[in-house]
Every structure is written in C-alpha cells, then in structure tokens.
C-alpha cells in the first residue's frame, strides 16, 4: 500500500514542486492549505502565504497534479501560538521570530495531528532543508544543498516525533532547479516571486499591527547612553530592536545604535556600533535535535538570526534550563527573543531562545 503524505501547500513554487516530487516517488499525496489569517477581507489575507490568493493558486496546482486538495482551518492555533506570542514579546522589549513559532506549533504540531487523524503517514513542506537519521537513532535537520536558501534555522525546534513523520523533498535542489522543474511540468506558479515579509504584517509595520490588534498604546520613554545619561525621548519600546540604526530620531552628530531595551524602566540604551557586539549569550526554551541533551562543554557553530552566517562558539549548560554560548569572536546585535541555532557540521544540534 502506498504511504500517504499531506503536503502543506502555500500556493508557491516550492510546496508545489514538493507535491509533484512526492507523487513521482510513488506517495499517495494530499494537498492542504492552512487557513490561518483572522480576517479574510484584509489585504494580508489576499497576499499572504496562507490567504485567499494562496488557496486559489494551491487549488489550481493540485488540479494540475491530479491530487486531492483541502483547506484546513487553523485560525485559533495561529492566533494563540503566533500572533499573541508575537505581540507579547514585542511588549516585553524582545524581538520574536513568528515563523519559528508557526513551524513548531501550527505547520507541524497542528497539521501533523490533523494529518495523522485522517490516516496520513507523513506531512511534507517546501522548506529548503533535509532530514537525516543519525547512527544514534535520532533525527536531525541538515543544511540544504543551497546555502542561499537554507531554512534549517527556522526548523530547529521540531521534535523527534515531528521529524519522524516529516518529508522535505526539495532540500536536495537549488531554487533555480525547483523553478526549472515547475516550468518543465507546466505548473502555473513557476515564476511566482518568493514572499519576503511576515505573512500577517505585509507592510512590515510591527508597531502599527500591535496597536491595531490589541489597542496597545506605546508609552514614550527615555533614550539613555551606555553610561545611563538621558539623551532623548523614544516613541515606545515596541518601535525598536537591538542593532537598529534607522528611525531613532536622534541627532548626536555620529551614528547611533540600539544596544539594549529595558522594559522594566521603559528605557532604550543607545551606543556606538562597537557597543552592539557581544562575546557571549544565554538561551532558554532549549530543544536539542541531534543529541538528547548537552552533557558537557562542546564546540559548535551558532547562528543568532536567519541571515547570520554563523560563528564558531563553545557551549555549555549554565544551569538546568539555560545554555551559555561563548563565541570565538564577538558577534553583532545579540537580540533577546530571537533564536540561537547550533550546528555540528551540517547537522542542527539544537537551539533555544536568546534571553
């Protein structure tokens, strides 16, 4: 009997080709688009990765591939695990990564649960990453063949159970190869551009979204320098992130950067570019992937944001729930709320949330 796989289809070329490749490999493929946006009438719903146009594109591709297609409602799961988390983190002066939360709790936890209930063996997506089972029996995410599109950073906190039921068919392909496959088989979305912004904030106005979503009003406070001197007034901490230079509204006669955000005093610390570099960081909410736990100090490569190339570091457990990461060379803009993702060669070792 054929193995059944549910493919999360966003209406883009990557998930469309993923569905095609799995069908070619002999799987019984079902296409599913996750309906996550709260208001179908919004512009975001029309253009987002799981909105109205995504449903239309995905349904059209499923028809071309001759596979069953469904839309599943995950609005509540998305609201609780992604939007509410995003808003709460910004209000605490942190900079969250909603895509990581969406992957763990919506695209995998919720979609996998629903898929297993309808008799599927696996779920699959169009992420540029690969899954390997190691000699120790554990599953890990590995870098895709194309570093430019590698998406392992956003998948570091998947569980072993989730990985054992996951297929990532385009991890062995480059983006150009994926588009070439789509063109060759006549998929209508072959030339569709990649989505770049957060799907529920297409205008990138995070502060505006938080205000519209919750009615929260930013409370102005003081800009202070690294010595604690007041040097100006800010618009509210939700407008800033560590490392930020633009939009500060400060005339100091030299470049100024956000060094830290202090929600307890409603202060934003400003300094020179050199002040933004840190030799170490701490992380919690840990998830280990290629190893069950960190028993002793070890070397790794650490990435502190999606676009970070990664830097060599030494890691150890600081306490039962906190990891200490010391970099060989200071890294720029260590940002609370973002993920630290650790690599052992091409394999994801694990990661956590920067504190």
Spell out what each predicted region is:
Residues 124-133, 140-355:
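AMP-forming adenylation/ATP pyrophosphatase catalytic core
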Residues 1-156, 167, 176-177:
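ATP-dependent adenylation/nucleotidyltransferase module used to activate substrates
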